[in-house]
């Protein structure tokens, strides 16, 4: 009984001490989550900026080929002097020379070729990376300029080639026909012929560009070559109706019915090799497409210029004699000459396409190309000639030659432009 009462007192004291300790302890703080400070990040581009251009314009791998018909025009061949004149009056002295009142210019300072037909074929490969390889080759048909003039049986009208006569210091003319009985009538004919052929090839890498909606933009870099071949010839034929009216190499012993003539030939060959850069913009819808291309090439033009001339005499019996030198081509300027010049070749093109099927497209477009520093045959003519070096001139051999005509490489520019109609097939 006493032990039970003692244990009850001990338990009561222990509970009282525990309660007091709990009341004196500091209040418990509420739990809280501590967050780490935010890490700064590069802000994203505004949505309106990202919508302007996608950084790359990647397309699936594809191959395409195209073929175009070309309808082009080129810059006519310039000449350093009018080549053929005529006159119907006998009061001018000398007749048919430049600056005389009765002189008519029959072939002026530019020879036109008209419209050229041609072709252009191309091949391209679009890589999955967005790069593309493109190549094309074009060729224009060879076209000619032709001029013919002849007098009647009385030598009317006067037909001539004008030149500046360095022996006497005046504008003069070599007569091909003459109807003046006082100086000797003779008949004659002249022919002027010129020809041109143009072709070229290029290989480009098109870089992966930017896009916006239906538009895509690419850069171009590559290599191109061009070839321009041209010629000019002047041929005369004079018939002596009576003894001694015409001379050959200073001799008037030309019987009636004999034929004398002059031949001048000028040819040029231009080869351009250079690197090029450019850009291309394209627009594509489900049916229509538009491509605009601009590029410029820098490089060297290698030139070969050939000058030759001769005169001939054909006797009534058929015996022939040929001597060097015509009119504008004499031993003083004849020969084969080589030159290399720096050239720039810019080109611009516009093409509109219509999708015929999922793989076939019809195209129509326009191209303009310019080429600086080229040699053209007519520019190589020196219009200053000493009359005493012309084998068919009456004054042949009367004074020592003075080196005229002389050869000087004369540069010109060239352009070609026109329309193209074609088809493009994509594999």
Label each residue range with its predicted role:
Residues 299-305:
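Short acidic/glycine-rich loop or secondary-structure boundary segments that cap or lie
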Residues 1-7:
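Bacterial N-terminal signal peptides that target proteins for export
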Residues 83-104, 155-182, 235-265, 306-336, ...:
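Solvent-exposed loop segments that connect transmembrane elements
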Residues 23-80, 103-151, 171-237, 257-299, ...:
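Outer-membrane beta-barrel transmembrane strands
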Residues 17-21:
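Sec/Tat signal peptide C-region and signal peptidase I cleavage site
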Residues 7-16:
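Bacterial N-terminal signal peptides
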Residues 10, 22-23:
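Viral structural modules
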């Amino acid at each position: 009984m006493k032990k039970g009462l003692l244990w009850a007192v001990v338990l009561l004291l222990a509970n009282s001490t525990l309660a007091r300790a709990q009341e004196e302890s500091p209040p418990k703080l509420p739990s809280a989550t501590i967050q780490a400070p935010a890490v700064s990040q590069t802000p994203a581009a505004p949505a309106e900026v990202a919508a302007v251009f996608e950084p790359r314009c990647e397309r699936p791998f594809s191959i395409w080929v195209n073929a175009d018909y070309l309808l082009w025009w080129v810059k006519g061949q310039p000449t350093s002097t009018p080549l053929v004149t005529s006159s119907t009056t006998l009061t001018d002295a000398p007749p048919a020379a430049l600056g005389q009142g009765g002189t008519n210019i029959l072939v002026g300072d530019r020879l036109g070729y008209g419209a050229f037909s041609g072709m252009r074929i191309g091949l391209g490969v679009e890589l999955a990376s967005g790069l593309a390889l493109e190549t094309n080759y074009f060729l224009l048909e060879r076209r000619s300029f032709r001029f013919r003039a002849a007098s009647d049986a009385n030598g009317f009208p006067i037909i001539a080639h004008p030149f500046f006569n360095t022996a006497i210091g005046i504008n003069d003319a070599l007569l091909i026909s003459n109807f003046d009985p006082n100086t000797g009538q003779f008949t004659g004919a002249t022919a002027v012929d010129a020809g041109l052929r143009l072709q070229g090839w290029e290989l480009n890498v098109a870089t992966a560009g930017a896009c916006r909606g239906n538009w895509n933009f690419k850069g171009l870099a590559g290599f191109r070559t061009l070839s321009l071949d041209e010629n000019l010839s002047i041929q005369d034929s004079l018939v002596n109706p009576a003894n001694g009216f015409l001379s050959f190499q200073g001799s008037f012993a030309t019987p009636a019915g004999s034929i004398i003539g002059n031949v001048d030939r000028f040819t040029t060959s231009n080869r351009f090799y250079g690197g090029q850069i450019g850009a291309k913009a394209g627009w594509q819808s489900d049916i229509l497409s538009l491509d605009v291309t601009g590029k410029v090439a820098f490089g060297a033009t290698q030139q070969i210029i050939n000058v030759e001339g001769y005169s001939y005499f054909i006797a009534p019996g058929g015996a022939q004699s040929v001597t060097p030198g015509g009119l504008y081509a004499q031993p003083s300027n004849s020969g084969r000459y080589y030159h290399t010049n720096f050239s720039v070749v810019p080109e611009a093109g516009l093409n509109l396409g219509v999708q015929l099927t999922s793989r076939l497209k019809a195209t129509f477009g326009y191209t303009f190309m310019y080429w600086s520093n080229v040699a053209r045959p007519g520019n190589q003519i020196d219009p200053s000639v000493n009359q005493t070096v012309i084998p068919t001139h009456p004054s042949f051999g009367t004074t020592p030659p003075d080196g005229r005509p002389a050869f000087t490489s004369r540069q010109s520019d060239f352009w070609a432009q026109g329309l193209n109609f074609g088809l493009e097939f994509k594999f």
